[in-house]
Amino acid sequence: MNDTRTSRSARFDTTPVVVEDLGLIDYHAAWELQRTIAAERAEGAGSDRLLLLEHPSVYTAGRRTEDADLPIDGSPVVQVDRGGKITWHGPGQLVGYPIVRLAEPVDVVDYVRRLEEALISVCTELGLTVGRVEGRSGVWLPATETLAERKIAAIGIRVQRGVALHGISFNCNSALDGFQAIVPCGIQDAGVTTLTRELGREVTVAEVKPMVATAVVQALNGDLPVRDHDLPRPGTTPAAPNSTRVRSMT
């Protein structure tokens, strides 16, 4: 992949990122808080923040969501201004919203890759082999003889007036029932999984939260370089180590 910016910070400011643990919080309340912080950052006020939290069960639909993607059981959906399609949030899933004024010139793809890198590093530390799938954002486990590729972390962002909003969702020990009524992120040929399911032990949000906080801040500050973690896909040749590639983003 084309890695031209990871030796320096993705952030405009050099002041420390303020990490806040909001616990379990309603989606609308968290969204309003995001917008308030983002407006301050666009004016050069306040500090970059990383909000870490869980939501009560809720579906959110990004700008590319189509009618066919909506829940088959008629569950209500919150329409939001991030990229991507529909997803589910709920207890047992760690959500992170970095509200960050980005360095200029703004590079959205680079920013997303840094968030992916942070989550990949956490999975690796926990003992999971994960990576990226060409043309799809997020963090994935490779396909096996019996299982399709499985997404363990999703990313959906918006950049407005040079400030990033929304962010990451990382499945720790969440129930997967919420995903059954939708096609998560509009991807029909892959699955969804959790850390608990893949590691064969209970992995809680509380265990993972400090790891994610550290990794995200390191990635945004340029202390965690973005590396090539492309997963081999059926019918493709795995990329050579340290190879570079320009990626598309969905």
UniProtKB/Swiss-Prot annotation:
Name the EC number(s). 2.3.1.181
Q: Note on file?
A: In the reaction, the free carboxyl group of octanoic acid is attached via an amide linkage to the epsilon-amino group of a specific lysine residue of lipoyl domains of lipoate-dependent enzymes.
Task: Specify the domain of life of the species encoding this protein.
Answer: Bacteria
Q: Which stretches make up the BPL/LPL catalytic domain? A: 44-224
Residues binding substrate, per UniProt: 82-89, 154-156, 167-169
Q: Which residues cross the membrane?
A: none
Function according to Swiss-Prot or TrEMBL: Catalyzes the transfer of endogenously produced octanoic acid from octanoyl-acyl-carrier-protein onto the lipoyl domains of lipoate-dependent enzymes. Lipoyl-ACP can also act as a substrate although octanoyl-ACP is likely to be the physiological substrate.
The protein's name in its UniProt record: Octanoyltransferase
Instruction: Supply the alphabetized keyword list.
Output: Acyltransferase, Cytoplasm, Transferase
GO CC annotations on file: cytoplasm
The residue ranges flagged as biased composition, category Polar residues, are: 239-250
> Which InterPro entries would you find in this protein's record?
aa-tRNA-synth_II/BPL/LPL, BPL_LPL_catalytic, Octanoyltransferase, Octanoyltransferase_CS
Site description Lowers pKa of active site Cys, residues in chain: 151
Enzymatic reactions? octanoyl-[ACP] + L-lysyl-[protein] = N(6)-octanoyl-L-lysyl-[protein] + holo-[ACP] + H(+)
Q: What class of enzyme is it?
A: transferase
Sorted alphabetically, the Gene Ontology BP terms of this entry are: protein modification process
Q: Which family does it belong to?
A: Belongs to the LipB family.
- Recorded metabolic or biological pathway in which this protein acts: Protein modification; protein lipoylation via endogenous pathway; protein N(6)-(lipoyl)lysine from octanoyl-[acyl-carrier-protein]: step 1/2
Name where it's found.
Cytoplasm
Catalytic residues at 185
GO MF term (any one): lipoyl(octanoyl) transferase activity
Spell out the residue ranges making up region: Disordered. Answer: 224-250
